[in-house]
């Protein structure tokens, strides 16, 4: 299973399989020399100390009750309106082209977009979706946390590091995510 699929599962509603997904993601990331694995290890420690019901409550509070941390990427880019609707229609078409099964989630949900990134073989479409949509939306979501108290902040920070490094590796250029990452980590 690839990293984007694992992160997709991690940012989806928590279930009994979450711990295994986080551990697998940490295992894959442990070969990298960055903070991504450490951030997920902190999240894993939280998960192991906390009941599943409590993790689900925190997930709901974080992503469903705070607009700043909404997992709907189109909302962060366009707000509610026709531009978001067009964005979602485009995503649905892209998903259809790679036979990505649609879930009960809207097409601009972070977990669905990550599943698509895992599935798609079109590097230009993936790069466009990452640079123009995912990185700016993740930046807004991270800004919405306002502190270090929410365990899901670590997950999103780890995801941003992974995305930024993957894109740098692919095209050997500094991505906008590097500046965004430095903004959130103080350099």
Give the positions of each predicted feature.
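Charged, alpha-helix-forming regions
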Residues: 1-110, 115-187
């Amino acid at each position: 299973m690839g990293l984007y699929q694992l992160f997709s599962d991690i940012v989806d509603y928590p279930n009994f399989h979450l711990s295994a997904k986080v551990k697998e993601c940490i295992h894959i990331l442990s070969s990298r020399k960055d903070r991504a694995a450490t951030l997920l290890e902190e999240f894993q420690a939280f998960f192991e100390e906390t009941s599943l019901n409590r993790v689900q409550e925190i997930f709901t509070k974080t992503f469903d009750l705070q607009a700043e941390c909404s997992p709907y990427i189109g909302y962060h880019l366009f707000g509610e309106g026709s531009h978001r609707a067009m964005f979602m229609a485009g995503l649905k078409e892209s998903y259809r082209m790679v036979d990505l099964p649609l879930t009960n989630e809207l097409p601009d949900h972070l977990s669905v977009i990550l599943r698509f990134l895992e599935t798609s073989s079109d590097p230009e479409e993936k790069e466009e979706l990452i640079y123009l949509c995912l990185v700016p939306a993740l930046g807004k979501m991270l800004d919405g946390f306002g502190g270090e108290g929410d365990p899901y902040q670590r997950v999103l920070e780890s995801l941003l590091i992974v995305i930024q490094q993957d894109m740098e590796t692919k095209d050997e250029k500094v991505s906008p995510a590097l500046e965004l990452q430095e903004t959130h980590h103080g350099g």
